[in-house]
Design a protein with these regions (language model features):
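Conserved glycine-rich Rossmann-like NAD(P)H-binding loop of the short-chain dehydrogenase/reductase
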Residues: 24-38
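Active-site helix of classical SDR
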Residues: 111, 147
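C-terminal helical subdomain
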Residues: 171-172, 189-227
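Conserved glycine-rich cofactor-binding loop
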Residues: 11-12
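Substrate-binding pocket helix/loop in short-chain dehydrogenase/reductase
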Residues: 87-88, 95-100
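The beta1-alpha1 cofactor-binding region of Rossmann-like NAD(H)/NADP(H)-dependent oxidoreductases
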Residues: 50-61, 93
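Residue(s) in the substrate-gating loop at a strand-loop-helix junction
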Residues: 131
């Protein structure tokens, strides 16, 4: 039976790989890059919505629109995220705010928005794509680390709250991957030994396909060369 799955940050990288891996379902990808959204939507033949997850008003409207069209959202995958690296003293306040907004506030906004319909049905799955930085802090990534530690705290707290309503929440903690997240942050870090996003997407699929009475509170995945 097809499930309705919303994936934030779905226009590239891991988000796109997840959409492709789960494409036998009703997939709706979200991103604030409309050009890439349209391209990936055509490639994967999936639905999409332009949505900036840092704008809670836009998030509410987007989620309501999806629920109105599909009747329900079975799974939310909070994947959108950005990297911020460098000495804190040389980091602008705008970049600090952006990192916290995307990595921490964004998943909180989208989770809040989907919970109403999930509460009504007393079922649903939320996967929060965090990071190994939620456990181990990298050097000169102070704000990024803080945003991911915050997400782990949110994840563990919301699990207890919503499990009483029949909703499952999984914290997903990948190591660094072969994506352009470093490049977009202005970092030329070599990601060639990182995880292939296709392998990470298969791990997400495993969580999605678990039996209804099984919950995976936390799931970590790393490339063996970087263990």
């Amino acid at each position: 039976m097809k499930k309705t799955i919303v994936i934030t940050g779905g226009s590239e990288g891991l988000g796109k790989a997840i959409a492709k891996q789960l494409n036998n379902n009703e997939i709706i990808i979200l991103s604030d890059n409309e050009e890439k959204l349209v391209k990936v939507s055509k490639e994967l033949k999936c639905d999409y919505r332009f949505c900036d997850v840092t704008d809670y008003g836009q998030v509410d409207v987007t989620i309501k629109d999806i629920v109105d069209k599909y009747g329900e959202i079975d799974i939310l995958i909070n994947n959108a995220g950005i990297l911020l690296a460098g000495d804190l003293t040389e980091t602008s306040y705008d970049r600090i705010s952006k990192c916290i907004d995307v990595n921490t506030k964004g998943p909180i906004y989208t989770t809040k928005a989907v919970l109403e319909s999930m509460y009504q049905r007393e079922e649903g799955l939320i996967i929060n794509v965090c990071s190994q930085a939620s456990f181990d802090s990298d050097d000169f990534s102070t704000v990024y680390n803080a945003s991911k530690w915050a997400m782990r705290g949110f994840n563990r707290s919301i699990q207890k709250d919503v499990s009483k309503k029949g909703i499952k929440v999984t914290g997903f903690y990948p190591g660094f991957m072969q994506t352009n997240i470093f490049k977009k942050a202005g970092n030329d870090y070599d990601t060639s030994t990182g995880l292939e996003v296709e392998k990470v997407a298969k791990a997400i699929e495993f969580i999605v396909n678990c039996e209804d009475d099984v919950i995976i509170p936390e799931f970590g995945i790393k490339d063996i060369e970087n263990y």
